[in-house]
């Protein structure tokens, strides 16, 4: 069975078997996840980002510290801290040069780090046939666009130039990320610096437009579903600095179909009840089939980095591993 058919089958299974019924596992877990979120969390984070934009980052530092908890890792995964900003996850007891996933964490470009994406990176590496390089890029608003993007491009270049040291196959480097990290992965793939360096992309509910898009999902899920519109707009302002929001390096969704067809083969996994859902859907449609899109209809934002939506997380890990290890 070809990869496209495999992904279609998985998408159908996610919709029909675990995503279609109102009492599905994904829906029950997502609803429980939302109910467990502290009251006022989104408003607190929005205010913290807005204060940081104005020059007072004390509240944002508190948010960053709260998202920087060490994670318990799998016994069959070893971790190498290559530098302050690069952490390599390697499956134990596997010989030969493996494919590599270079992963960019989410957090609205303003918080998150190596620890916030550790659970996902560890889970992918634990599958046994992929190494994962997590990247701690500079954060906004202290370091607005293009600082974080430059750091991510540098990480891909480092992996490409040090394949022997890392024990990877330089021809099978992929990049990925969730939310704002997915935005960075897209921009890296289309950058002149990394053109041709990536074999594939794996994206989870990526930001593809750094502005309020007014779509159906933006209106319907803009409050109470894990990422509120006010917080997303604060993230956008922080990252943009003085950059035009229609710059294609921050709003890849504005690229033409011809430009998007320059992407490596891409898997986009969407949450059905997410403010960013329609951005990703439009991007996939515009790509002319370059982007394979899978939707978990009952999931909400954050299933990659914040525990609570275990079924969506597990399926995302499985899809990632299958996509990256699929030989072309």
Regions found by a protein language model. Give the residues of each.
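Catalytic active-site module of serine/aspartate enzymes centered on a nucleophile-bearing elbow/loop
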Residues: 307-328
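Short amphipathic alpha-helix adjacent to the substrate-entry channel of hydrolases
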Residues: 115-133
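Alpha/beta-hydrolase active-site loop
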Residues: 143-163
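A glycine/proline-hinged amphipathic helix-loop "lid/cap" segment
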Residues: 2-91, 245, 328
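Short beta-strand/loop motif that positions the catalytic acidic residue
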Residues: 268-270
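Hydrolase active-site cap/lid region
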Residues: 190-243
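Gly/Ser-rich "nucleophile elbow"/oxyanion-hole loop immediately N-terminal to the catalytic nucleophile
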Residues: 160-174
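Short beta-strand element of the alpha/beta-hydrolase
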Residues: 97-106
């Amino acid at each position: 069975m070809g990869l496209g058919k495999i992904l279609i089958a998985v998408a159908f299974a996610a919709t029909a078997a675990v995503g279609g019924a109102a009492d599905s596992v994904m829906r029950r877990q997502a609803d429980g996840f939302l109910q467990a979120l502290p009251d006022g969390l989104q408003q607190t984070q929005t205010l913290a980002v807005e204060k940081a934009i104005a020059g007072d980052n004390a509240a944002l530092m508190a948010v960053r510290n709260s998202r920087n908890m060490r994670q318990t890792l799998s016994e069959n995964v070893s971790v190498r801290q290559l530098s302050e900003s690069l952490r390599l996850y390697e499956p134990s007891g596997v010989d030969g040069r493996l494919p590599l996933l270079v992963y960019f964490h989410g957090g609205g470009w303003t918080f998150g780090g190596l620890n916030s994406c550790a659970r996902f990176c560890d889970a992918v590496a634990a599958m046994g046939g992929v190494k994962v390089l997590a990247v701690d890029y500079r954060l906004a608003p202290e370091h607005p666009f293009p600082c974080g993007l430059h750091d991510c491009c540098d990480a891909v270049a480092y992996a490409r130039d040090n394949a022997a040291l890392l024990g990877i196959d330089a021809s099978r480097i992929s990049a990925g990320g969730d939310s704002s990290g997915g935005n960075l992965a897209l921009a890296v793939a289309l950058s002149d610096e990394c053109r041709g360096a990536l074999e594939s992309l794996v994206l989870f509910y990526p930001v593809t437009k750094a502005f309020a898009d007014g779509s159906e999902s933006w209106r319907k899920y803009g409050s109470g579903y894990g990422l509120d519109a006010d917080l997303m707009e604060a993230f956008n302002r922080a990252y943009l600095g003085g950059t035009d929001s229609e710059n294609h390096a921050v709003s890849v969704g504005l690229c033409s179909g011809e430009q998007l067809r320059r992407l490596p083969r891409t898997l986009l996994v969407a949450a059905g009840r997410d403010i960013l859902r329609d951005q990703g859907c439009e991007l996939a449609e515009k790509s002319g089939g370059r982007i394979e899109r899978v939707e978990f209809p009952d999931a909400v934002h954050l299933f990659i980095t914040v525990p609570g939506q275990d079924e969506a997380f597990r399926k995302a890990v499985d899809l990632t591993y299958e996509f990256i290890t699929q030989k072309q």
